[in-house]
């Protein structure tokens, strides 16, 4: 996207979607109408399957406007264009049903699915053939030539494909002023693929998966030996297949000497245990025992502070164990690592550098939104909340207890409590009136850094909750802070 015309203003757009005002129209333009000028390569002959990215990064409540994007009307060269929500994805070859079932529960498959659900609402793709030889390439569309002066028309010399977007009445000029639009934009994840080759003996089949500082193991991508034999985490028969494969298992720690990483993890477990069980001592009537319990709480607070200050940036190592090998040889393991919370809050506009040679121009690689969503591995207490949600709800949110358990699973120790109320609001869809809502009030123990983090938390939680809930559940999420 090179240029955009919105609310009587002509903007120049760079590769980070930042807009620079070029000129103001001399006459009024149609309301709720945006023109997008595309610089299209000569080798591209059709706009079919081109995905457009739309965002309102400066609006705190942008979800209701993203929800209405499928209601927009698109056209090029005076001809309407049929659009569908979501980014274009190539269709994959069908897999054998058993393997496809287990792959759907793979860690990376689950993460990729969640990321796509978060960003699909930003994308609209062209779902019909739009031959470019039927669309005139011009510096300004004919409908706008009379709106700008001769000076502006002389500056606009590049031949562009102009796409017209008409928004619903819910979009005011102030809202459209915050619109960012672009193409050639894709969701990215903070992960790095490692490849490690190890020589193994038949009697010792343990492979340490190395990670660097601030890195954590995310998932194992593939395991193969020198004979070309593949290894999987689960053993399942494939009907009609003669392929031979083995199995492996992943273990965290237990194969190395006791070091500072083990000490920090063990102290964290001890603190969780003390926090959970200290209240039992207060129920005893003995004054001496209660005084000792008070001293123990003070020592626990000091111990927690000392644990937080331990400068250990490496996690407890993981080990891949081959269950059975036919003979000794080399095993090649590919696995993903991530930087967890360290990769959060990288601001929009930051230039990116590719790790390897790509077919893309490195000068055009940049973030168009702030990164968020990275989490550390759950602590022991948070694991209990995750197990509780999985056992009670089975991945579906139907009751208020399910909503509270889901929020606790997502936010962990940051969430003090969840208050859920029934409410009513005016639907953003023009044909609907008042709709019932579920108002989720999140009471946090620690204040977030700013409105942008609150917006990211609301959008992420809203998307994840909606994906697990019935279509009749309309959520409104509010963030409050514990004053106690």
Locate each region found by the language model.
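Intrinsically disordered, low-complexity, polar/charged repeat-rich segments
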Residues: 1-484
């Amino acid at each position: 996207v090179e240029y955009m015309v919105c609310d009587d203003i002509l903007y120049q757009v760079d590769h980070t979607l930042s807009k620079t005002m070029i000129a103001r129209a001399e006459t009024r333009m149609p309301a709720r109408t945006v023109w997008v000028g595309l610089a299209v390569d000569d080798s591209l002959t059709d706009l079919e399957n081109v995905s457009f990215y739309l965002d309102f990064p400066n609006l705190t409540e942008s979800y209701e406007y993203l929800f209405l994007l499928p209601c927009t009307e698109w056209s090029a060269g005076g001809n309407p264009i049929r659009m569908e929500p979501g980014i274009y994805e190539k269709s994959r070859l069908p897999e054998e049903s058993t393997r496809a079932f287990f792959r759907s529960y793979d860690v990376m498959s689950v993460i990729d699915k969640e990321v796509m659900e978060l960003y699909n609402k930003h994308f609209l793709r062209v779902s019909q053939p739009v031959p470019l030889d039927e669309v005139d390439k011009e510096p300004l569309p004919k409908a706008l030539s009379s709106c700008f002066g001769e000076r502006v028309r002389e500056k606009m010399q590049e031949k562009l494909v102009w796409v017209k977007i008409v928004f619903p009445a819910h979009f005011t000029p102030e809202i459209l002023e915050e619109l960012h639009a672009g193409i050639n934009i894709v969701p990215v994840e903070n992960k790095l693929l490692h490849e490690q080759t190890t020589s193994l003996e038949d009697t010792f089949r343990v492979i340490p998966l190395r990670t660097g500082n601030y890195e954590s193991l995310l998932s194992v991508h593939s395991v193969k030996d020198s004979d070309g034999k593949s290894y999987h985490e689960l053993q399942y028969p494939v009907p009609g297949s003669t392929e031979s494969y083995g199995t492996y298992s992943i273990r965290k720690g237990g194969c190395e000497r006791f070091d500072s990483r083990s000490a920090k993890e063990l102290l964290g477990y001890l603190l969780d245990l003390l926090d959970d069980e200290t209240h039992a001592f207060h129920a005893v009537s003995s004054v001496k025992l209660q005084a000792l319990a008070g001293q123990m709480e003070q020592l626990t607070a000091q111990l927690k502070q000392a644990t937080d200050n331990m400068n250990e940036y490496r996690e407890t190592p993981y080990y891949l164990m081959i269950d059975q090998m036919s003979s000794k040889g080399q095993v090649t393991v590919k696995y993903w690592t991530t930087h967890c919370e360290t990769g959060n809050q990288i601001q929009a506009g930051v230039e990116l550098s590719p790790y390897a040679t790509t077919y893309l121009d490195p000068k055009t690689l940049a973030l168009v939104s702030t990164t968020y969503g990275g989490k550390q591995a759950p602590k022991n207490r948070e694991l209990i909340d995750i197990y509780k949600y999985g056992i009670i709800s089975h991945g579906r949110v139907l009751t208020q207890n399910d909503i509270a358990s889901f929020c606790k699973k997502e936010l962990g120790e940051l969430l003090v409590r969840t208050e859920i109320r029934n409410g009513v609001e005016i639907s953003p869809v023009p044909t609907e009136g008042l709709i019932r809502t579920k108002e989720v009030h999140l009471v946090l123990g620690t204040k977030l850094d700013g409105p942008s983090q609150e917006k990211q938390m609301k959008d992420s939680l809203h998307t994840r909750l909606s994906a697990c809930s019935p279509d009749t559940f309309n959520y409104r999420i509010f963030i409050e802070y514990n004053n106690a």
